[in-house]
Structure formats: structure tokens, C-alpha cells
């Protein structure tokens, strides 16, 4: 059971009562809908109203648009949703991750090259001030991966580099800046850590090959730093971490090894248990091959929930998932 009075929520007694009362009044369909972020394919008002009223989504990550377009879209969504929506953006490099006319500040690698965490703080502050102005309340950032392998096709310039201490310092500074915007939250990614493999989880299985000790001193230290300072959400990647999976379940065979999004060993054992994370766990995009190659969709969704995932990116097809 989640302790909503503890970090990172710190809800009051009346806040907790609102949550409990709201859940108690929900239908089963409404509860199912809360599991999903929809990837909004249209800003048509009828489509937006249908999405929240018929499918009861918990969050949305939308297609690019201008500030005026995104503001109006988010206004329609919130006005028609029974439960306030999580509206997410990808402000890794600037406010242009929330709207096309937002400010591009610079990649995380460019920020890290300065050696000055103040720039990462300002990236988090300014990017998400623009995001909040158009109605967003969650950033899928900071990217908290460590670029150990230059052949990695996913993270590249999206990281704060290959030094875990610098990554931790910069990622924390970004989060601190984002938190200066009232009510704004961060989702660090991609747990348990990308940057070692040459494979791309969009099209194949990807593996974090570190030993438990190596992981603790690198990715573990980065995530522990963010968790200790109030990180609200973590995006689980479609990445395997065999050492820690077998630490929590020594009987696991190679065939049974699953990516974090399907692994109770990594979500419940490592992230919840060892690191003490009490916030939200969401999947990376659920149509990536790193997830879909493991089992059919009708099995993936309940397996991820059983592993400890709270929300999915995205619907594959609304009717199918519902």
C-alpha cells in the first residue's frame, strides 16, 4: 500500500481522503482508464472529449503543436476529465519539448559540458515554466542514463555524460529547477539504466550488464540521489538487468529474464525495496519491440501491473487495451 503522506507526495489528511473517496466512487472502467497515458492523435474537440469521457485516461502525452494549440487542447481535456489529468511533455532540452514555439535551451550533454550544475537547474526551471504555462504538469525528464558505450543508439546527446557523479549532480539540479514551478513533477528515465548496450529497445531487447556492485555505484547512486530529493516518478525502460534480477530471484533462467517493465524483481525488489521509491512507476512506450517481443499484448498489460507498474505509455489501440 502506498503511503501518500510520505515522500514524494506528502499529502495531508484531507488530501488523502479526497484520493480515497475519488477511487471509491470510480467504476471498474474508470479505474482501468487511469492506468493509461494516451498519445493524443488529434486536437479536435470532439476527439478530446471522447478520449476522457469514454476511456477515462489518467494522462496524456500529445503530438507537437504551438503554445496556443497545446494550451487550448489541455484546457479542453482538464475541463472534461472527471479526475485531474497528468499532462506530460518531453522537456529534456527546453520548452520546445512542450510546444513547438517553446525555447530550445540545449541538450543535456551540452549542459553537462559546462561543468556547472546551475545551467542544469536553469534548464529544469525555464523549460518547465514554459511547459506549465501551456497546462503541462509532468516532464519525462531528466534523462538519468549514463553513456558508457558511444555506440548506444538511444541516449547519446540526451545524457549528462559518462561520469555517474556528474549525471547525479546535473539530474538533481534539473529536478530542483523543475520543482520551482508549483505543482510540477519529474519522471526520471530509463530505469534501470541505459547506456551500456549497442542495441535499441525500440527495436530489440536491451541489457544493462553491470554487476550489482557496479550498478550500485553508478545508476543506483543516480536514482538514489533523485529519490532522496523528492523525485515523483520513474519511467521504467524495456531493459534487462540480470545481476539484480537474479539477486532477488536466484532461480531465474535466461528465458525467464524480463525487462524492467515486466520484472517484479527490478520494480518491487530493487526500485521499491532497496531504493525505497514510493512514487509512480510508468512504462516507456508500450509499443516498443523491447516489450512487445516478450509476449502478446493481452498478457503484457497484466504482467506489467503484476510487476509493479502503475501506468502505461500508451494505448496500442483503445478498444483492444480496454
Task: Please tell me what each predicted stretch does.
Residues 1-106:
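N-terminal hydrophobic targeting/anchoring segments and the immediately downstream early-domain regions
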Residues 27, 70-79, 85, 95-97, ...:
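Second-shell residues forming the walls of enzyme active-site clefts
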Residues 34-44, 108-122, 204-218, 287-295:
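Active-site mouth loops of central-metabolism enzymes
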Residues 37, 52-62, 137-145, 308-312:
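Divalent metal-dependent hydrolysis catalytic cores, especially in the metallo-beta-lactamase
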Residues 41-54, 120-130, 214-225, 295-301:
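Short, acidic/polar
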Residues 66-70, 113-129, 164-169, 213-216:
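Glycine-rich anion/phosphate-binding loops
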Residues 90, 127-139, 183:
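Acidic-leg catalytic submotif of subtilisin-like serine proteases
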Residues 144-154:
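Short, conserved phosphate-binding/catalytic loop or strand-edge motifs used
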Amino acid at each position: 500500500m502506498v503511503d501518500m503522506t510520505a515522500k514524494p507526495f506528502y499529502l495531508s489528511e484531507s488530501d488523502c481522503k479526497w484520493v480515497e473517496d475519488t477511487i471509491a466512487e470510480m467504476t471498474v472502467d474508470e479505474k482501468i482508464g487511469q492506468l493509461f497515458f494516451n498519445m493524443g492523435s488529434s486536437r479536435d474537440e470532439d476527439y478530446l472529449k471522447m478520449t476522457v469521457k469514454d476511456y477515462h485516461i489518467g494522462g496524456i502525452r500529445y503530438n507537437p503543436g504551438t503554445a496556443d494549440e497545446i494550451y487550448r487542447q489541455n484546457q479542453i481535456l482538464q475541463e472534461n476529465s472527471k479526475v485531474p489529468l497528468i499532462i506530460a511533455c518531453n522537456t529534456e532540452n527546453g520548452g520546445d519539448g512542450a510546444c513547438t514555439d517553446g525555447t530550445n535551451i540545449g541538450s543535456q550533454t551540452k549542459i553537462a559540458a559546462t561543468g556547472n550544475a546551475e545551467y542544469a537547474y536553469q534548464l529544469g526551471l525555464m523549460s518547465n515554466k514554459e511547459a506549465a504555462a501551456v497546462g503541462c504538469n509532468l516532464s519525462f525528464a531528466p534523462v538519468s542514463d549514463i553513456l558508457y558505450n558511444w555506440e548506444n543508439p538511444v541516449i547519446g546527446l540526451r545524457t549528462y555524460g559518462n561520469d555517474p557523479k556528474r549525471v547525479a549532480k546535473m539530474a538533481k539540479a534539473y529536478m530542483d529547477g523543475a520543482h520551482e514551478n508549483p505543482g510540477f513533477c519529474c519522471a526520471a528515465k530509463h530505469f534501470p539504466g541505459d547506456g551500456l548496450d549497442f542495441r535499441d529497445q525500440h527495436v530489440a531487447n536491451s541489457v544493462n550488464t553491470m554487476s550489482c556492485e557496479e550498478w550500485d555505484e553508478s545508476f543506483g547512486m543516480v536514482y538514489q540521489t533523485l529519490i532522496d530529493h523528492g523525485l515523483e516518478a520513474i519511467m521504467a525502460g524495456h531493459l534487462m538487468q540480470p545481476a539484480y534480477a537474479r539477486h532477488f530471484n536466484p532461480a531465474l533462467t535466461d528465458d525467464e529474464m524480463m525487462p524492467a517493465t515486466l520484472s517484479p524483481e527490478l520494480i518491487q525488489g530493487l526500485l521499491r525495496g532497496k531504493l525505497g521509491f514510493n512514487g509512480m512507476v510508468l512504462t516507456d512506450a508500450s509499443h516498443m519491440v523491447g516489450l512487445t517481443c516478450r509476449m502478446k499484448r493481452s498478457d503484457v498489460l497484466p504482467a506489467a501491473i503484476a510487476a509493479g507498474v502503475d501506468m502505461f505509455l500508451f494505448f496500442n489501440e483503445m478498444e483492444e487495451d480496454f
